[in-house]
Structure formats: C-alpha cells, structure tokens
Amino acid sequence: KLAGMKYIVITAKHHEGMAMWDTNVASFKDYTGKTMFSLQQYTPFGKTGRDVLMELKTACDKAGIKFGLYYSIIDWNHSSQTINGDFTKMKSMAARTAYIRDMKAQLKELVDRYDPAIMWFDGDWTYRRKAPTLAKWWTKADGKDLYKYVKSLKSSILVNERVCRGFKLGDFECPERSIPEKAPSRPWETCQSMNDAWGYKKDLENSYRSYKYLIRELVDVASKSGNYL
C-alpha cells in the first residue's frame, strides 16, 4: 500500500489443480478420486477452518486495495485431462464438456464468496481458432463464452485477455515478462516475478532481480500507461 499498490492477484487455482478455497464442485478431487483437492483438505492451515482467500480479501478491503483472483483453465490433476508436456489433453469430448461446466461452477463459487474485482485467467495455451480436438481443446468460442459467463456473475469484474489470448478478448492485455516498445491500444499490464520462477525452485531462491531492475521496468510500464503485476 505504501509503495503505491492498487490491486493484487492471488492464485485461486494454478495448473496443478489445487483449490485454495473449500470448493464443493465434486469432480475436483485428488488422484484417488476420494478427497477434494483443496487447501482445506490437504494442509494443516486449511484443516483449522481458516480461509486464506477471505483473510486476504478482508485485508485488501481494509487497505483500499482491489482484490483479484488467478484461475488456470488447464488442470493437470483433473480426471478429464492427461498431462501433455506443459499442456493437457482431454480424454474425450464428453469429458471436455463436463470439465468446462464444472470449471464454471468453481468460478461461480469464487465470485459469490470473494467478490473479486479482477478474474485473471491463464492456461489457455491449448487453444484453436475453430473446432476443438482432444489435444487442442480450448477455442476462441470457448474464450468468448467464458468471458460472457464471468461477466454475467458480476458485470463490473475485469477479465484479462487469457480467456483465449490472441483474439483481443477480455478487458485488458497482459504480456508476460515483456514490455511492448509502444503502448498498446487497449488497457494493459505486464506480469513479472521477483526471480526466474513463478513458484518455489530451490536453485533460484537466492537469485532475485535487483531493485534497480524492477524499478526500471515499473517506470517503463507506467510511462506507457500500463500496470505492473
């Protein structure tokens, strides 16, 4: 807040599929198919009954900081999909239909419970322009539909372009670890990490970017009317 932060985006579900809230959507179970794959079921923190997303949401509201949630479209753990490199492959078209339905149910949980100002999608890499296949199972039409669905849950929510990138969808552009030479025509942000990883990597724990590097990027982004996430 003192540094000028206006909003945050916290991971609700990343590619590995663990829900950081007490989801009730039945298909999001662990590899055994018996236990919900969530923070509440898998960690000592969650089993105390605490809700990390709500605690952070409450703190943001108190500080006047907008609260955003990150959600991955692909899910390495979900029974509908198999891991295909960094991507996933659908087991069948019926599984694809059911997964998209259940993904929307999780998104409704998140919007209803936490009232986020931003829904930040990722994991749309398997996209196609036209009809889906099992390997390229996400389409431009799916992205448009997902955007419309989230807006139906909360009309004022901001949604990034990664409902299906490359087609000018969503409310703002979000290049990753890069800054365009010229300011984009639409609202935009770029996302950056403090080191070369988006999560814990033992060999990178002490290789943080210098404050001069980060401030230089922040100034460059701000000079082009962007946000620095």
Regions of interest found by a model, annotated:
Residues 1-229:
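Mature catalytic domains of secreted/periplasmic carbohydrate-active enzymes
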